[in-house]
């Protein structure tokens, strides 16, 4: 295992622990809404010039009946997703949709079309931490086209 990968995994686990702890202390609310990611951490990677490590928290709403499919999006760099709460479904074009439970992870290669991200439940949402490696100055997501 490379040094960079060990650091990424350690950061992901730390961010997941912080997010899970904060969630456990929060008062109960209605079902979460899917929204933009909440950025938790960003830093330059000295051993990968021109790249940044970004950690975000994702809140994934329950799948509503009749909800249209998302057109999807892409990421300019690698994305490692760790589910901290609930069960989510993640899909990348050309691969079967994966059901990912609390404590499990999902990987997206740079430029892959990410076309499914939803809770596996119609009544309960899910939460996840995404660790992203992005080129300096690049957005976190790109349109599907």
Question: Which residues make up each language-model segment?
Answer:
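Ligand-binding loop in jelly-roll beta-barrel domains
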Residues: 97, 111-139
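Glycine- and acidic-residue-biased ligand/ion/polar-headgroup-sensing regions
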Residues: 76-94, 102-104
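Bacterial N-terminal signal peptides
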Residues: 8-18
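Bacterial N-terminal signal peptides that target proteins for export
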Residues: 1-9
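Histidine-centered metal-chelating micro-motifs
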Residues: 65-70, 89, 96, 106-119
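A short glycine-rich, His/Asp/Glu-containing loop-to-beta-strand
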Residues: 33-71
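Short acidic-glycine-tyrosine-enriched beta hairpin
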Residues: 49-50, 60-61, 94-111
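Cleaved targeting-peptide boundary
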Residues: 21-34
């Amino acid at each position: 295992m490379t040094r960079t990968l060990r650091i990424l995994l350690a950061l992901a686990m730390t961010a997941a622990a912080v997010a899970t702890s904060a969630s456990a202390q929060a008062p109960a609310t209605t079902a979460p809404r899917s929204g933009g990611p909440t950025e938790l951490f960003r830093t330059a990677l000295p051993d990968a010039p021109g790249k940044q490590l970004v950690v975000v928290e994702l809140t994934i709403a329950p799948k509503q009946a009749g909800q249209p499919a998302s057109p999807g999006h892409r990421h300019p760099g690698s994305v490692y997703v760790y589910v901290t709460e609930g069960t989510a479904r993640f899909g990348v074009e050309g691969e079967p949709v994966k059901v990912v439970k609390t404590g499990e992870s999902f990987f997206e290669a740079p430029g892959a079309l990410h076309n499914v991200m939803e809770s596996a439940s119609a009544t309960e949402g899910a939460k996840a931490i995404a660790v992203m490696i992005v080129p300096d100055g690049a957005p976190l997501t790109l349109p599907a086209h």
